[in-house]
Amino acid sequence: MHRNSARIVVAGQPVNWLGANFWSRTGGPLMWRNYDPDTVRKELAVLREHGLGMTRSFFYWPDFMPEPDRIDDAMTERFADFLERHAEADMSTVPTFIVGHMSGENWDPPWRDGRDLYTDVWMVARQAWFAGEMVRRFGAHPAVCGWLVSNEMPIYSGGSAPREVIAAWAQIIRDAVRAAGGQQPFSLGDGAWGTQASSQHAGFALADAARLCDFLGPHVYPVGDDEVRQHYTAAWECELAGTFGRPVVLEEFGVSSDFVSGANAARYYRQVLHNSLLAGATGWIGWCNSDYDDLAGQDPYRHHAFELHFGLTDSHGRPKPQLTEMKAFADTLRAVDIGRCQRAPADTALVVSSYLDTSYPFTAPSDPGYIYDTLRQAYVSARLADLPVALTRESEGVGGDAMLYLVPSVKQLLAPTWHQLERLARAGATVYVSYSPGSAGWHRGPSYGHLNAMFGVEHQLRAGLVDAIEDDQVAFNFVKDFGTLAAGTRLTFRAGGNEHSRAYLPVRPDGAEVLAADGHGRPALLLRRVGAGSVVLCTYPVEHMAAATPRANPEATSAIYEALGAHAGVRKLVTADDRRVACDVLVRSDGARFAWLVSQASEPVTVKPELAPGLWLARLDGSATDGAATLDPFGVGVFRLENAPAATPSTP
């Protein structure tokens, strides 16, 4: 299956953005009142020295548009100088029009007077006029490389609105930008916050944004209870956004030094940068360029003190560890010539239930959050199993070109989808489904359409009840060889979930063969051969159990996924012998292949990757390795995959 690697195009050339969200340390959001060109020059210089080539900048709306029909010329003169400082540093910027929300506070021009930003016709016209005026003044400057409508409009607007209203608002602003001559890449700046890329209901739909925008821009600041999931959440949201075929820019990510130590901040940046690259991201804009210790008495920093310390540099311009990590990432991008690289195709598809992104009548409000968390955990397990995985949305039609379909801990799909999955299996694919009754008491149970016939079992469910998992640790004892798992193998899983979801599916085989039994001798993993392929049923919600368990990863689901991949014939160019190390491959347009090894181990680890026949592992400079790779704690290694030289025939 194709995996999205779309690139932003600027002036006819594909580009990758690496930069910082920018407020000068002279004023934060009030920088335009206290603008100092020399300070900006120094701030940009340190970013450029560390490999960053662009910024995201902001028109602070109350200052730039003090009256509904007037632009403040003093502010625009300062922004013009700001663009010159970028040109001087050989950098570019993406201005943001409606600001709006910033760093824990909403900032209104006084003339808004509570008007609705989406439905008040006069108010929408004022926004469109302002965007058009900024484009007319600055759109021809070579330092402008894109446009954003807002900063996190779902927060600034004060609530949600119907999807069609928000789409119309976005189109009006987009049309104003284009009418004013703005041909640079355009997007919304909304954070990609909506049920198509998260479990949030904000009225914004990525499908609409993809139709209107040149790229999609997730803002990701996860809070969780599992470090590995933290490291993959930004990548997961980039994958979800990428299903719409547009370039994906990780528009905001970062950490406050008040919350995270310097070493751990660097580690987090490293993981987010590399994992999101492997998830198809084409740009990375960290939050933000500087600390603001001198602004402690100024809102929003006065009441959100942690916002003082999100910087890539401290308040004196000295690089923090996360900026050093961005430089290392920039060096890697340059070494592999990232603009010419694409993700290798995938043989594995992760099925995204339409109940994540579609509102069906009389379904539980908690369903989208449950699905998001479960799918994210399944994605982590697939990555740690070294399975190149593509997402396929049920709402867009499940793609038919994968060898392995993962349907993890699922309560419900549409009835026709179950029959489609069985047809895919009959045509030669392997379809894996793990059971879940869902996490809500509403319609509790598997809505599978034809469960018994599809999986070759007879379920033993009882009216209104779930079969609770009473063991704190669930055991899978393999009674038959399956893929990479030999008979006699024992896998264990920590049980998790609530009174509804911590449940297994009692079944009797009726045509399916039992691959593994639980600790009580009940079927835990079953296989039914159908046509040229097979369906595999897991009677425990192993992905949901892990998703509901703190500090769960790495865990044994990745071993099941690895076995599924082997059973299905999934092709992998590189795989590690340690489930704490994830492998993936980028392919350059000249045929060069680059292997990424990303460690989730808290200590140094040495692995000897298993390579596809005819390949050997080389350093980026082309020199040979001994076939092994040593990674620092939570480290990343990037290598070339070279063709092994042909053997020289021996002479008689």
For the regions a language model picked out, list residue spans one by one.
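A conserved amphipathic helix/loop scaffold
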Residues: 412-652
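Catalytic-core region of carbohydrate-active enzymes that cleave or remodel glycosidic bonds
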Residues: 173-176, 181-185, 210-211, 215, ...
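Acidic-and-aromatic substrate-binding clefts and catalytic sites of carbohydrate-active enzymes
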Residues: 32-38, 63-73, 154-157, 192-201, ...
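Active-site beta-loop-alpha junctions enriched in small/polar residues
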Residues: 23-25, 60, 98-102, 150-152, ...
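Aromatic- and carboxylate-lined catalytic core of secreted/periplasmic carbohydrate-active enzymes
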Residues: 275, 279-362, 375-388, 453-498, ...
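Active-site mouth of glycoside hydrolases
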Residues: 2-208
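Phosphate-binding active sites in nucleotide-utilizing proteins
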Residues: 368-413
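A short helix->loop->beta-strand "cap" motif at the edges of active sites that frequently abuts
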Residues: 91, 182-184, 244-246, 426-430, ...
